[in-house]
Protein backbone atom coordinates (compact mmCIF):
# COMPACT_ATOMS: atom_id res chain seq x y z
CA UNK A 1 0.00 0.00 0.00
CA UNK A 2 1.35 3.38 -0.95
CA UNK A 3 0.64 6.61 0.87
CA UNK A 4 1.05 10.27 -0.02
CA UNK A 5 3.11 12.68 2.06
CA UNK A 6 0.00 14.66 3.03
CA UNK A 7 -1.95 11.65 4.22
CA UNK A 8 1.12 10.41 6.10
CA UNK A 9 1.20 13.63 8.11
CA UNK A 10 -2.42 13.16 9.17
CA UNK A 11 -1.87 9.54 10.07
CA UNK A 12 1.28 10.19 12.08
CA UNK A 13 -0.35 13.03 13.98
CA UNK A 14 -3.35 10.86 14.78
CA UNK A 15 -1.15 7.97 15.90
CA UNK A 16 1.01 10.14 18.16
CA UNK A 17 -1.40 12.73 19.59
CA UNK A 18 -4.90 11.41 18.81
CA UNK A 19 -5.49 14.71 17.04
CA UNK A 20 -5.74 15.91 13.45
CA UNK A 21 -5.23 19.50 12.27
CA UNK A 22 -7.36 20.26 9.23
CA UNK A 23 -6.89 23.35 7.07
CA UNK A 24 -10.17 25.02 6.16
CA UNK A 25 -10.51 27.40 3.20
CA UNK A 26 -7.48 29.07 1.63
CA UNK A 27 -5.71 32.38 1.25
CA UNK A 28 -6.30 35.07 3.91
CA UNK A 29 -9.36 33.20 5.18
CA UNK A 30 -7.44 29.99 5.81
CA UNK A 31 -7.63 28.62 9.32
CA UNK A 32 -6.82 25.40 11.09
CA UNK A 33 -9.34 23.32 12.98
CA UNK A 34 -8.13 20.65 15.37
CA UNK A 35 -10.14 17.46 15.70
CA UNK A 36 -9.69 15.39 18.83
CA UNK A 37 -9.84 11.62 18.33
CA UNK A 38 -10.78 8.92 20.77
CA UNK A 39 -7.84 6.67 21.70
CA UNK A 40 -7.50 3.86 19.17
CA UNK A 41 -5.24 1.00 18.17
CA UNK A 42 -4.07 0.99 14.56
CA UNK A 43 -3.22 -2.31 12.91
CA UNK A 44 -1.69 -2.16 9.45
CA UNK A 45 -0.96 -4.87 6.92
CA UNK A 46 0.82 -4.65 3.59
CA UNK A 47 2.69 -6.81 1.13
CA UNK A 48 4.76 -3.79 0.10
CA UNK A 49 6.30 -2.33 3.23
CA UNK A 50 9.02 -0.72 1.13
CA UNK A 51 6.40 1.63 -0.31
CA UNK A 52 5.75 3.15 3.13
CA UNK A 53 7.80 6.15 4.17
CA UNK A 54 10.30 5.54 6.96
CA UNK A 55 8.60 7.95 9.40
CA UNK A 56 5.28 6.19 8.82
CA UNK A 57 6.74 2.72 9.21
CA UNK A 58 8.57 3.69 12.39
CA UNK A 59 5.35 4.88 14.05
CA UNK A 60 4.23 1.27 14.42
CA UNK A 61 5.46 0.06 17.81
CA UNK A 62 5.37 -3.61 16.81
CA UNK A 63 6.38 -4.88 13.38
CA UNK A 64 6.03 -8.54 12.46
CA UNK A 65 6.44 -10.52 9.27
CA UNK A 66 3.73 -13.10 8.62
CA UNK A 67 4.67 -16.40 7.01
CA UNK A 68 2.55 -18.81 5.01
CA UNK A 69 0.84 -21.59 6.95
CA UNK A 70 2.44 -25.03 6.79
CA UNK A 71 0.50 -28.05 5.52
CA UNK A 72 -0.16 -29.52 8.97
CA UNK A 73 -1.74 -26.33 10.29
CA UNK A 74 -3.75 -25.85 7.11
CA UNK A 75 -4.98 -29.42 7.45
CA UNK A 76 -6.32 -28.55 10.90
CA UNK A 77 -8.05 -25.51 9.44
CA UNK A 78 -9.66 -27.65 6.72
CA UNK A 79 -10.80 -30.15 9.35
CA UNK A 80 -12.29 -27.37 11.47
CA UNK A 81 -14.05 -25.80 8.47
CA UNK A 82 -15.46 -29.17 7.45
CA UNK A 83 -16.94 -29.48 10.94
CA UNK A 84 -18.60 -26.09 10.60
CA UNK A 85 -19.99 -27.14 7.21
CA UNK A 86 -21.04 -30.51 8.68
CA UNK A 87 -19.06 -32.47 6.10
CA UNK A 88 -17.88 -36.06 6.31
CA UNK A 89 -14.18 -35.98 5.48
CA UNK A 90 -11.15 -38.04 6.49
CA UNK A 91 -7.77 -36.69 7.61
CA UNK A 92 -6.00 -37.73 4.41
CA UNK A 93 -8.41 -35.64 2.39
CA UNK A 94 -7.92 -32.67 4.72
CA UNK A 95 -4.17 -32.89 4.23
CA UNK A 96 -4.50 -33.27 0.45
CA UNK A 97 -6.54 -30.08 0.27
CA UNK A 98 -4.11 -28.33 2.62
CA UNK A 99 -0.99 -29.13 0.63
CA UNK A 100 -2.52 -27.72 -2.54
CA UNK A 101 -3.62 -24.47 -0.88
CA UNK A 102 -0.51 -22.35 -1.46
CA UNK A 103 -0.08 -21.83 2.28
CA UNK A 104 -3.28 -19.77 2.47
CA UNK A 105 -6.33 -20.59 4.65
CA UNK A 106 -8.65 -18.70 2.32
CA UNK A 107 -7.66 -20.98 -0.55
CA UNK A 108 -8.00 -24.05 1.69
CA UNK A 109 -11.58 -23.14 2.56
CA UNK A 110 -12.40 -22.34 -1.05
CA UNK A 111 -11.03 -25.69 -2.27
CA UNK A 112 -12.88 -27.50 0.51
CA UNK A 113 -16.18 -26.08 -0.72
CA UNK A 114 -15.41 -27.02 -4.31
CA UNK A 115 -14.45 -30.56 -3.27
CA UNK A 116 -17.70 -30.73 -1.31
CA UNK A 117 -19.63 -29.90 -4.50
CA UNK A 118 -17.98 -32.80 -6.32
CA UNK A 119 -18.59 -35.12 -3.37
CA UNK A 120 -22.29 -34.30 -3.27
CA UNK A 121 -22.61 -35.42 -6.88
CA UNK A 122 -20.08 -38.26 -7.03
CA UNK A 123 -20.13 -39.86 -3.59
CA UNK A 124 -23.27 -38.88 -1.67
CA UNK A 125 -21.47 -36.05 0.10
CA UNK A 126 -18.72 -38.16 1.70
CA UNK A 127 -15.24 -36.78 1.03
CA UNK A 128 -12.46 -39.35 0.77
CA UNK A 129 -9.01 -39.14 -0.78
CA UNK A 130 -10.16 -40.44 -4.16
CA UNK A 131 -12.92 -37.88 -4.62
CA UNK A 132 -10.61 -35.15 -3.28
CA UNK A 133 -7.92 -35.88 -5.87
CA UNK A 134 -10.53 -36.16 -8.61
CA UNK A 135 -12.09 -32.81 -7.67
CA UNK A 136 -8.79 -30.97 -7.42
CA UNK A 137 -7.61 -32.43 -10.72
CA UNK A 138 -10.87 -31.32 -12.34
CA UNK A 139 -10.24 -27.84 -10.97
CA UNK A 140 -6.75 -27.88 -12.54
CA UNK A 141 -5.06 -27.60 -9.14
CA UNK A 142 -2.05 -29.93 -9.26
CA UNK A 143 -0.21 -31.68 -6.42
CA UNK A 144 1.99 -28.63 -5.80
CA UNK A 145 -0.92 -26.22 -5.66
CA UNK A 146 -0.25 -24.76 -9.09
CA UNK A 147 -3.32 -23.87 -11.12
CA UNK A 148 -3.81 -23.68 -14.87
CA UNK A 149 -2.26 -20.22 -15.27
CA UNK A 150 0.76 -21.11 -13.11
CA UNK A 151 1.51 -24.04 -15.38
CA UNK A 152 0.89 -21.98 -18.51
CA UNK A 153 3.50 -19.50 -17.34
CA UNK A 154 6.06 -22.26 -16.86
CA UNK A 155 5.19 -23.91 -20.18
CA UNK A 156 5.37 -20.61 -22.05
CA UNK A 157 8.84 -19.78 -20.72
CA UNK A 158 10.10 -23.30 -21.46
CA UNK A 159 8.45 -23.93 -24.83
CA UNK A 160 8.65 -20.48 -26.39
CA UNK A 161 11.73 -18.98 -24.79
CA UNK A 162 14.01 -21.94 -24.05
CA UNK A 163 13.37 -21.67 -20.32
CA UNK A 164 14.34 -18.00 -20.17
CA UNK A 165 15.46 -15.56 -19.15
CA UNK A 166 12.59 -13.64 -20.69
CA UNK A 167 10.99 -10.32 -19.79
CA UNK A 168 7.72 -10.08 -17.87
CA UNK A 169 5.97 -8.05 -20.57
CA UNK A 170 6.90 -10.67 -23.16
CA UNK A 171 5.44 -13.45 -21.01
CA UNK A 172 2.29 -11.40 -20.45
CA UNK A 173 1.85 -10.78 -24.17
CA UNK A 174 2.30 -14.47 -24.94
CA UNK A 175 -0.42 -15.36 -22.44
CA UNK A 176 -2.74 -12.44 -23.27
CA UNK A 177 -2.57 -11.47 -19.61
CA UNK A 178 -1.80 -8.26 -17.75
CA UNK A 179 1.82 -7.88 -16.58
CA UNK A 180 0.77 -6.67 -13.14
CA UNK A 181 -1.50 -9.68 -12.68
CA UNK A 182 1.31 -12.11 -13.44
CA UNK A 183 3.76 -10.22 -11.23
CA UNK A 184 1.46 -9.81 -8.24
CA UNK A 185 -0.82 -12.87 -8.38
CA UNK A 186 1.13 -15.76 -9.90
CA UNK A 187 4.84 -14.99 -9.81
CA UNK A 188 5.32 -14.72 -6.01
CA UNK A 189 4.23 -18.33 -5.42
CA UNK A 190 6.26 -19.65 -8.35
CA UNK A 191 9.37 -17.92 -7.01
CA UNK A 192 8.68 -18.92 -3.41
CA UNK A 193 8.36 -22.57 -4.41
CA UNK A 194 11.49 -22.41 -6.55
CA UNK A 195 9.91 -22.97 -9.96
CA UNK A 196 11.23 -19.76 -11.46
CA UNK A 197 13.84 -17.15 -10.57
CA UNK A 198 14.28 -13.50 -11.42
CA UNK A 199 17.48 -12.49 -13.17
CA UNK A 200 18.64 -9.10 -14.48
CA UNK A 201 17.53 -10.27 -17.93
CA UNK A 202 14.13 -11.59 -16.92
CA UNK A 203 12.35 -14.68 -15.58
CA UNK A 204 13.92 -18.11 -15.87
CA UNK A 205 12.53 -21.57 -15.13
CA UNK A 206 14.60 -23.58 -12.65
CA UNK A 207 15.43 -27.26 -12.77
CA UNK A 208 12.60 -27.83 -10.30
CA UNK A 209 10.26 -26.10 -12.74
CA UNK A 210 11.39 -28.40 -15.55
CA UNK A 211 10.89 -31.44 -13.33
CA UNK A 212 7.41 -30.24 -12.43
CA UNK A 213 6.51 -30.15 -16.12
CA UNK A 214 8.07 -33.56 -16.65
CA UNK A 215 10.78 -32.09 -18.87
CA UNK A 216 14.53 -32.64 -18.93
CA UNK A 217 16.31 -29.30 -18.83
CA UNK A 218 19.39 -30.51 -20.72
CA UNK A 219 17.35 -32.16 -23.47
CA UNK A 220 15.19 -29.07 -23.77
CA UNK A 221 18.22 -26.83 -24.19
CA UNK A 222 19.65 -29.12 -26.86
CA UNK A 223 16.54 -28.57 -28.97
CA UNK A 224 17.43 -24.88 -29.25
CA UNK A 225 21.16 -25.33 -29.89
Regions found by a protein language model. Name each.
Residues 1-6, 10:
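Single conserved hydrophobic/aromatic residue that forms the stacking wall/gate
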Residues 157-225:
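Terminal-proximal interaction/regulatory segments of ATP-powered molecular machines
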Amino acid sequence: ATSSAASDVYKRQAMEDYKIDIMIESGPNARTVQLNLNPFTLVGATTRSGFLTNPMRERFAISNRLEHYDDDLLSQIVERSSGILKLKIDKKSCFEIARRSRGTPRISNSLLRRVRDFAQIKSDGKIDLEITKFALSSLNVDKNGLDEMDNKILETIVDKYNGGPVGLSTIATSLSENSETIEEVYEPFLIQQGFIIRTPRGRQVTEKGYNHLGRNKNNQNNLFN
